[in-house]
Amino acid sequence: MAGENSDNEPSSPASPSSAGFNTDQLPISTSQNSENFSDEEEAAVDTQVIRDEPDEAEDEEEEEGEDLFNDTFMNDYRKMDENDQYESNGIDDSVDDERDLGQAMLDRRAADADLDARENRLANRKLPHLLHDNDSDDWNYRPSKRSRTTVPPRGNGGDPDGNPPSSPGVSQPDISMTDQTDDYQDEDDNDDEAEFEMYRIQGTLREWVMRDEVRRFIAKKFKDFLLTYVKPKNENGDIEYVRLINEMVSANKCSLEIDYKEFIHVHPNIAIWLADAPQPVLEVMEEVSEKVIFDLHPNYKNIHTKIYVRVTNLPVNDQIRNIRQIHLNTMIRIGGVVTRRSGVFPQLQQVKYDCNKCGAVLGPFFQNSYSEVKVGSCSECQSKGPFTVNVEQTIYRNYQKLTIQESPGTVPAGRLPRHKEVILLNDLIDCARPGEEIEVTGIYTNNFDLSLNTKNGFPVFATVVEANYVTKKQDLFSAYKLTQEDKTQIEELSKDPRIVERIIKSIAPSIYGHEDIKTALALAMFGGQEKNIKGKHRLRGDINVLLLGDPGTAKSQFLKYVEKTGQRAVYTTGKGASAVGLTAAVHKDPVTREWTLEGGALVLADRGICLIDEFDKMNDQDRVSIHEAMEQQSISISKAGIVTSLQARCSVIAAANPVGGRYDSSKSFAQNVELTDPILSRFDILCVVKDVVDPVTDEMLAEFVVNSHFKSQPKGGKMEDSDPEDGIQGSSGSTDPEVLPQNLLKKYLTYSKLYVFPKLGELDAKKLETVYANLRRESMNGQGVSIATRHLESMIRMSEAHARMHLRQYVTEEDVNMAIRVLLDSFISTQKFGVQRTLRESFKRYITYKKDFNSLLLVLLKELVKNALKFEEIISGSNSGLPTIEVKIEELQTKAKEYDIADLRPFFSSTDFSKAHFELDHGRGMIKCPKRLITW
């Protein structure tokens, strides 16, 4: 039988292939003939294949079943006329179509064209070309598989670029979208309907953004954003992020900051995806950023192989105590104070393993924060271990953990502050220190913690925040935040000859008067120039200030103002701070159980300002502990086996009350304060504030305070629509245009510390030497603060600080005169009342330098009025009959010349003159004042 079948032709009617069966299931000899084999060889093959005679063992095992391919299987296809009869009921072979064959073919082609058009419309509606995928499992949207004649659009079955022609039912853009040679190819920008379909999320958002076509869509939009975005207020039309990329490269950084508010304005849907599914979206954005940056700067990849995208200005600011399960795997923004910081540890990023049995190197395996790498078996020897990490070929990344606690001002009354752990990676390492208040933008994730399960008795996941962007609240006006427009504005402002007076007026504008304190605080905030002679002898450049005076003279308010305005200002009180609280403490870390150092207020204020209120209430032991910090600006520690030195390079501004509550000018300075000479000599400026009863000054002060309260009300006065960003905290700012906005003052202060380093000249040094020698001679006669060498250094520091206010790189005579004036005011204010007058006469040419002459002339005029009253009382025995008191202008001019004041016209037109109820009579050359208004 086999030989007969093998002799038949494949096309014979009796062959299975002619009957329409699949010849792959038949023996080779029955499906096709080979010209290379003879009949004997073919028969031999047939004997082995077709004549399959089973063994007896197989018959016993397979008793059931039938061999379909036996010797007689072809009999199933023989012709049987009696059985090959079909019913004719219901079957009509007649054709009613009267068309000819040609017309029928034309109609068939037209019907096929209609079907093709219908399928294209359905495909565009349900699944646009942008989402076509050859590997899609959705049969509802699978293109039609009916075999129709498809004519290629171009010759040779392809396009000019050499791409293969489209398969039937699949458009050419579909093939280009699934081409894996280019991850992110640009699509048709005019395909609005396809872009609309990209926002129709199918399934969960995380799964949606991980699809290849969606990743390509996000990459395209983000690349366009980086290369085309222009700020609305940018008149030059500069591309914002190209400029930021150039600044990032020039600063040798690897983090590109993206403003979320700008991004959501251009691409709102993708920005929402970034907030709700940040991990996959950030991966795409970082890949695009690397490609864009390395295209603009090809050699930068030799410096940084990885670019990180940092998201700034996330609009939602969550509280730590309000974070819930709904925030998991989303981007959040929280704030708090850093309470603990771990060391820097290496974390696996790209790991390779060695098989201990065969020595094969397995990997690389990529480790991330969301999954753990586990090797199942060796690909070489198929063993299941053991495996060891290949240290040489494994790549690590930096890892650090912070613990932040809710800020004291945000904790509800009666509640304990909550805390949360923050993970820092890569270039975010050491971006914050304990004690600093920071804001963290990151991904809220969870990890398995076995200790929590053991403690709670049921499965619990520990939650952490993987930081993406960290900013300090004190660094809002740091160097990289100063734009070119800010720098230009600051440089123009420094050309104002009255810039120092404007800065002093801008210090605590809500506090009336106290020009000497405001001048001292301004000098301390700008600071002098630090010197380190050949790395052996270091001289501090920070200026220390002590405010000593009666209660109610706004000493604490000045400190609070400096805390908000100064850079890295730390506020503490003398009674609430111990010695270790000011310097440093040694304690055991609760995690590692090792002795660690925790810095105090002076350490946390490094390169800033430390503010100490109630300085006189400190214990003597605690006060002695800051001696080293105030002069050498370092803190030495030798405790628990830790011998080290911490940096405390900061200005100290302290406030204290005199003995008995009020300052008595009839007593010496040592009798008024309980501070020793070693601590007093470390203060560069001493400001003695006395609450003196003066009806004119008191009336002006009362008017200022009342107006300040009235105009600060939500619906009171004319300041209802005032801008709070101007930082004007009182009524003085509304009438005085010379007061600088507080934001501008902060930027001016930052700019001066970054770019201005003044130097002292030889002529100025000689002048300082002369004044110092005279002060030493006068201090031996008085009972105030003794003048030491430190005060000479203080004058140098104040000269440099005054030069910084003008943004000058050198010290001029004007700066030296200002420093001498401030030091003389400080020295004279500590003397007894009788000695003060003598010293003012001796140094009056320095004391009156650049002082507000109006207040000085007002004091001189009041003295002349008092003398006139006394003279009239002596002559006539009584002054009750005088309606007004008159003083000659010549007498005031004579007094003013003693203080080198020649022009009195500004004083006569000032508000101080009019508010004191004085009237000017030019015709008679007299100054009149009603006697009934004289209360001094």
Swiss-Prot record:
One of its GO terms (biological process) is regulation of cell population proliferation. One of its GO terms (cellular component) is THO complex. Residues 499-705 form the MCM domain. Residues 1-105, 126-190, 711-739 are annotated as: Disordered. A zinc finger (C4-type) spans 355-381. A motif (Arginine finger) lies at residues 681-684. Expressed in root apical meristem, lateral root meristem primordia, leaf primordia, shoot apical meristem and flower buds. Disruption phenotype: Embryonic lethality when homozygous. Pfam families: MCM (PF00493), MCM2_N (PF12619), MCM_lid (PF17855), MCM_N (PF14551), MCM_OB (PF17207), WH_MCM2 (PF23669). Keywords: ATP-binding, Cell cycle, DNA replication, DNA-binding, Helicase, Host-virus interaction, Hydrolase, Metal-binding, Nucleotide-binding, Nucleus, Zinc, Zinc-finger. ATP binds at residues 549-556. It is found in: Nucleus. Component of the minichromosome maintenance (MCM) complex, a heterotetramer composed of MCM2, MCM3, MCM4, MCM5, MCM6 and MCM7. Interacts with ETG1 and the replication-associated protein of the geminivirus mungbean yellow mosaic virus (MYMV). Over-expression of MCM2 strongly reduces plant and cell sizes and inhibits endoreduplication. Probable component of the MCM2-7 complex (MCM complex) that may function as a DNA helicase and which is essential to undergo a single round of replication initiation and elongation per cell cycle in eukaryotic cells. May play a crucial role in the control of de-differentiation and cell proliferation processes required for lateral root formation. Is essential for embryo development. Is involved in the geminivirus mungbean yellow mosaic virus (MYMV) DNA replication, presumably in conjunction with other host factors. PANTHER family: DNA REPLICATION LICENSING FACTOR MCM FAMILY MEMBER (PTHR11630), DNA REPLICATION LICENSING FACTOR MCM2 (PTHR11630:SF44). This is DNA replication licensing factor MCM2. It comes from Arabidopsis thaliana (Mouse-ear cress). The gene is MCM2.
